């Protein structure tokens, strides 16, 4: 935030790159964010399974990295606890991003700033008997890409196949 305050005093353009660790493991959000998501109120994913049925047939068995995130069989409590931690760390990260957006507003730079938000992957957190990212289900591979800034239409959604032309237009 100090950088934004300093950059706001200059007429020169600036670039700021932030790489949040969240929500990667270990997912350790402050308690106030964890408490926002009581375990007992979290629904299990509709595709929840206690076991990932293909771990042995794909030749991984106990070597499946997912096994380290929560042992099989996956209890309802273990899945809910993982979801709670995932939601909490994302909410905490969102609060930090909010501070940056507030600082851009307060310094008068918001309307002249491009913001690009993306992620490298999602997590299964209980879907299909999995917890991690090493799979090709939508929850793991459909990462967000949000662009905001001068000349970028608001509330416009693009399909994945149009991503390249979207990026070359801006």
PLM feature spans:
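Active-site-proximal cap/lid insertion segments
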Residues: 1-166
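Feature captures the catalytic ectodomains and active-site-proximal regions of enzymes
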Residues: 168-170
């Amino acid at each position: 935030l100090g950088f934004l305050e300093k950059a706001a005093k200059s007429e020169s353009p600036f670039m700021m790159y932030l790489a949040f660790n969240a929500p990667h493991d270990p997912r350790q959000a402050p308690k106030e964010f964890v408490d926002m998501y009581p375990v007992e109120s979290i629904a299990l994913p509709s595709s929840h399974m206690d076991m990932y049925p293909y771990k042995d047939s794909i030749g991984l068995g106990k070597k499946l990295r997912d096994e380290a995130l929560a042992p099989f069989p996956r209890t309802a409590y273990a899945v809910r606890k993982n979801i709670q931690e995932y939601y909490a760390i994302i909410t905490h990260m969102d609060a930090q991003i909010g501070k940056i957006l507030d600082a851009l507003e307060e310094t008068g730079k918001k309307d002249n700033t491009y913001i690009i938000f993306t992620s490298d992957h999602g997590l299964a957190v209980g879907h299909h008997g999995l917890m991690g990212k090493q799979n090709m289900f939508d929850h793991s591979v459909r990462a967000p890409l949000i662009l905001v800034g001068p000349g970028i239409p608001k509330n416009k959604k693009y399909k994945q196949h149009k991503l390249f032309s979207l990026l070359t237009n801006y």
